[in-house]
Amino acid sequence: MNQNNKHRTLLFRAALAAIAIAAAIFFWYQLKTPQQSSPSDQSSGLRHSPLPPVQVATAKEQAVPRFLAGLGTIQAANTATVTSRVEGQLIALHFQEGQQIKQGDLLAEIDPRPFQVQLAQAKGQLAKDEAILANARQDLNRYQKLANTHLISQQEMDNQRALVRQHEASLKVDQAAIDSAKLQLTYSRITAPISGKVGLKQIDVGNFISSGNSSSIVVITQTDPVDVLFSLPENDINAVLQAQKTNHDVVVSAWDRNNQQQLAAGKLLSIDNQIDATTGTIKLKARFSNQESILFPNQFVNVRIKVDTLENAVVIPNAALQMGNEGNFVWMLGKENKVSKHLVTVKLQDTKRVVISAGLAAGDKVVTDGIDRLTDGAKVDIVTPMVNKPQPQKHDQTENS
């Protein structure tokens, strides 16, 4: 029994010794084997650094155009409401709704027969009065012969001369009636007063149409070119006037409602002669070519008018500009990758870039991302933004959408 206990004790001690030796070998192997980074770290390329990571951009010197912005409305350069100048039955329409027409094109016809009858009557009256005048002149010639023999009085002679002049005047009245009848007959053929695009017809063939503005046939709008009417604050008028003096053709561009896509470019046409006392703005008009018919009357657009160009301007991304209690500032990257706060003066700013007039020079580096963790004099870790290539399937979906 004692021998069995001793044997078990020896086996237990031998097992413990083997475990201890195996553990020692394992830890020794771990210490000698270098650690490898995880696959995710290798694929992403991220660097684990105790320094705050930032992205930077370099201030650039470039020419920057200066624009004034406003909200405008497209207007047709000319609009004409086509009406009839004579009364009658409409017998024909010679246009299609939405058609582009030219000045002088035939649009509609009114029954011409009543006007042809009036013309014939006027011509008949002229022929009648011509015959009466011829007879009066013959009588006058006879009276003149008899006057030499004193067979008629001077009073009768004067009356005959007056009668001839009266009939001569009647011929002029008759000729005027003929001209009027011809004009009325011409008005029965209604032509386009301007070139442009016709709208929807306002009357159908077969209806009786009256003269004047009471019954219109169609409205024509001149859509090429078109005008844009917009307003600017009265404080901007001096910049516009100066731009007109420097460059007579002031460039104006029209943008879509989201202010993302330029629709057309044109030139400033005119400036109103007074400021609206209620709004403190002044109206301006620009003219645009519209050959592709992408601008429609009464369409709202964003307007940008170029007033000048800032040469050698210092430009930084809009993300670099910060606002503090002391004013506008940027985080500038200095030596040893240390950042410092610099106050700057802003000249111009839009959604993408900022023009700095003081506080920065071309070539200075400013922080654009990671700004919230910065302190003055802190050392930073500059990282490059990762650009993910779009997958083909997503790209196709974007194009289809």
UniProtKB/Swiss-Prot annotation:
InterPro entries (alphabetical): CusB_D23, Multidrug-R_MdtA, RND_pump_MFP
Lipid bilayer topology: Peripheral membrane protein
A cellular component term, taken from the record's GO annotations: plasma membrane
Biological process, per Gene Ontology: response to toxic substance
UniProt-recorded name of the protein: Multidrug resistance protein MdtA
Annotated signal peptide: 1-20
HAMAP family: MdtA
GO terms, molecular function: efflux transmembrane transporter activity
UniProt-annotated location(s): Cell inner membrane
Record note on quaternary structure: Part of a tripartite efflux system composed of MdtA, MdtB and MdtC.
Gene3D superfamilies membership: 2.40.30.170, 2.40.420.20, 2.40.50.100, Helix hairpin bin
Keywords attached to this entry: Cell inner membrane, Cell membrane, Membrane, Signal, Transport
Family: Belongs to the membrane fusion protein (MFP) (TC 8.A.1) family.
NCBIfam families, A to Z: PRK11556.1, RND_mfp
Domain of life: Bacteria
PANTHER family noted in UniProt: MULTIDRUG RESISTANCE PROTEIN MDTA
